[in-house]
Amino acid sequence: MRPSTPPLLMLLIVPAAWACTSPPATGPADGGAADAASPVADAGSPPADADPPPPVPQDAGPLPTCGDGTTPTILAAGGERTHGATMVITGCRFGDDDAPGPRLFDAVDNQPAYEGLSVGDVVPTDEDAPWTRNGSPWATEVRLAEEDARPHRAAFYRAAGGSHGGDGFLGWPRALGGTRPPADQLLLYVSWWYRPSMDPGGGEPEGANKFIRIWDNDGAERSYVSWTHMHIGYSGGERTGWRSFTQDGRVGRWNRMEIIVDAERGTVRHYVNGVYQRVSHSSVGEFDIDDYQKRPEFADLGLNVAVLGFDHGLTSYGAMVTDFGEIYIDTTRARVEIGDAPTWAETRHREIQLPTAWSDGSIEVTLQEGSLEGLSGRYLYVIDAEGNVNEEGFPL
């Protein structure tokens, strides 16, 4: 995207997120098949000027095997380690997925609905657009922006200006059913990148400022999860879970945000920059959210993202700028990540990958480098549908 007013799709025709290059086809290891019409060589001693025979390869030892276990195991990863390239991951216990890839991957610059739009234009909610809602009467409209985008991206979403400033959000994505999510949609995994220009709890009054709301309907009564800058509230729980964004989040920089809501297990798990946000309450101390309940009167509806951005309804954040993008939403925990540390627990910078094929023993992904500044020397992780992960990363 350009800083003036040319159409956004001038840079979106071949979205970087989905650029895919296949490795070149290779022939036989000896450089090609022998000519069938060639005469058979004399089985005796070779001519004096003949090339010496190739060395006999030494035993390389047994091929690696998966062995026993219950977690995904990566044995090999083939392909170039560059953004947009195709990587094939082989191993075992990945699980099967007949429909690989997220339900929605919105990198902004990969949305055909934004063709012809320019920097500063309002994000549309037309029938072909990914989102059905942009803001509210008390919020700033979300617009397209490009200034200081993450590496390999041409655009992102921005809320800024006016009396409400950084108060802006998108909601009810079409790919997940809009305001009528299907009844069997009881698990959501959501990942996105978020950059606040100021402390999202630094206004006066402070407010309760939502990063994301997950609902089953947009009526006055609903099942809900609301993650704010200081706590998380949810239906069914007897207490609010407290934890400040600024413990692990960074003002003025891009932050990886993740949340998993599972209505069948009754669990909510959320993360900032790879750190699990274990919450606390004065009555019990720290605790995990294992008592989330979807209200039975809404059994005909599943879960969807009602709000994503920054939602507060106050004027005390008028000077704030809210940037967000690279939104990945799926109905399974299964995914592929590349991280900055040799164990999953140590990773603090992870980039989610885009799967194009998935079976129990093989996964194909389109590589996303993000801001890792190179993929070689990083570590590969596969998470299965149950949330199991290879704790020891596979070195790239």
Set out the residue ranges of the language-model regions.
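Extracellular beta-strand elements of beta-rich domains used
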Residues: 108-109, 114, 192, 257, ...
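Beta-strand/beta-sandwich contexts
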Residues: 57-106, 110, 318, 327-354, ...
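Flexible glycan-contacting loops in extracellular carbohydrate-active proteins
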Residues: 281-323
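Extracellular glycan-recognition surfaces and repeat-rich motifs
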Residues: 115-156, 162
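Short, aromatic/His-centered strand-loop micro-motif at the edge of beta-sheets
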Residues: 234-256
